Design a protein with these regions (language model features):
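Negatively charged, low-complexity tracts enriched in Asp/Glu with abundant Ser/Thr
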Residues: 1-57, 121
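Intrinsically disordered, low-complexity regulatory segments enriched in Ser/Thr/Pro
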Residues: 49-103
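A short, charged, amphipathic alpha-helix used as a generic interaction element across diverse proteins
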Residues: 100-112
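Short arginine-rich
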Residues: 111-121
Length: 122
């Protein structure tokens, strides 16, 4: 699925509002090579301890497949270029496919909250 320009702007605004700690949002609206996804994908990043030499970069990616959206939490690089994963890169969480970006966003937030509860000592 590819998005029109006005839909891209709306999608960016939606994910920026849903995940305000993530920055440097970017997107692609086409297949650029065999190692990338077809269709529309957008991603933002959050850096844990950015002052460190080997800071860890977490990415949220929302990707389309056919007429559906899915959400992904990765570390090291965003889901869009996942076929070129390197040492230290990890695929952490995924959602199922949803009809809307909003539904995929809500589902990814729920998966992140579930992971945080599991890791919490409180």
């Amino acid at each position: 699925m590819f998005l029109a320009d006005h839909d891209i702007q709306h999608a960016l605004e939606q994910v920026q509002a849903a995940f305000p700690s993530f920055t440097q949002w970017a997107y692609t609206n086409a297949s650029e090579d065999e190692s990338s996804l077809d269709g529309f994908s957008l991603w933002g990043q959050w850096v844990l301890r950015p002052e460190e030499f080997m800071a860890r970069h977490f990415y949220l990616t929302f990707a389309t497949h056919a007429e559906h959206w899915s959400g992904h939490l990765t570390i090291g690089q965003h889901f869009y270029f996942w076929t070129s994963a390197d040492v230290g890169d990890a695929h952490l969480l995924d959602t199922e496919e949803y009809a809307t970006l909003e539904d995929a966003s809500v589902a990814l937030k729920a998966e992140i909250a579930r992971l945080c509860r599991a890791l919490s000592v409180v």
